[in-house]
Amino acid sequence: MVITSMAFEKLDFKRSNEIEMMKRSKSFHESIIKRRTVRDFSDEKVPIEIIFNAIKSASSAPSGANKQPWHFAIVSDPQVKHKIRKAAEKEEKEFYDNRAPDDWLKDLDQFGTDSRKPFLEVAPYLIVVFKKNYDLEGDKREKNYYVNESVGIASGFLLAALHDSGLATLTHTPSPMGFLEKILDRPKNERAVLLIPVGYPAKDAKVPKLNKKSFESICSTF
């Protein structure tokens, strides 16, 4: 091992037998494939501790040089959610009317989406994921590494943790997202990358029937 100033500790790892490993891998697969993008939420309250636990799980994700270049903002205040909805719908209307290329709109048409985003107010929580290209230590900038990759992995952890907790989510990416930094008064080194409504699905919630690519088409062995 290379000599380093960092302290190390023994890995906390308990090896399971292959039968148990197969059961666990199958159980996770059967659970995660039931996760769906939901646009119709119930306004029923959710204990915030569940949201905290999911974000704690997300923050355990690996990151470049362990810089942890992320920040998670939880929004439940109705007035703040209203501001976010209005700003998001303004950007989305511009997107649908003027910015989106025709092929993108054609691909979106089958889902029946438009610039209206009521879920941003109905869902009890919004989680905004911010990336930090650099950290600020006073006036000094400290560079972060593999920021997009690190935040992407953490976001995946977050979605899986929320689903495992029994909650529905939507990955919403209005573009541009600068309004989130302004509304939530985030520092200049943070950029919003993901807006996630979280809650229980509405009782009459429906999702599109989707076909996923075959395993053979998305995986190769060598």
Where are these regions (language model features)?
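Small-aliphatic-rich amphipathic alpha-helix that forms the alpha element of a beta-alpha
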Residues: 54-59, 133-183
